[in-house]
Amino acid sequence: LFRITIAALNVATAAGCDAFKTLNNSKKSAQGKPYELIVVCPQAEWTGEVGDSLRAIFTAPVPYLNQIEPIFDVLRVTERGFTGMVADHRNILKILVDPELKETTTAVQYDVTSDPQIVMTLQGPSDGALVKYLSENRENLVYALEKAERDRAVKANETYGNPGIESAILKTFGVEMKVPKGYTLAAQKPDFIWARNEYPTASQGFFIYSYPYEGKQSLTEEALVAARNK
């Protein structure tokens, strides 16, 4: 019989993380916390429609959480304040309005002054053009920033993993899985593994289980729930 292996993630509360420690010492370490975004924007745009659009996009609630948390913690600075450690932040979005520009575009750069870093520059000929562009490309803009955060997490987990739990998963299910540091093995059976990471004010964990595949009925919602509840 084939066996179905399922991994489930349970996040009780999203917890803040320390500033990312770069894995490459050739550049300065990027500043800031995960999912923190520096927006370099003139006062006129920030207090107008452009600022409203930026806040609506990047501080929108994260879907499916049991409490309201923004996608990004947005910190706005002016061009004058964009110096020193601020310029070394991990996530940066620059807003530029120039009437001489013919179209609205976004440029993406990586590791400009620090590592790991993403710098996005959104520029257009007018506030109206920027607002229109933001409305049409909001998902792509969020995706680029979220992907940068995920790539950093994957890189860190590959370098600083959890050999004990990774070995248990390989032995039990025959699959390789990268597990972050901090997790402990809460339970292990021939077809079940539960790992968790406890914080002072939050709990994070996942479980993996398998059961025999006996046809399409084994993949119905009822079958999945029944196997999970064993």
Describe these PLM feature segments.
Residues 1-15:
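Sec-dependent bacterial lipoprotein signal peptides
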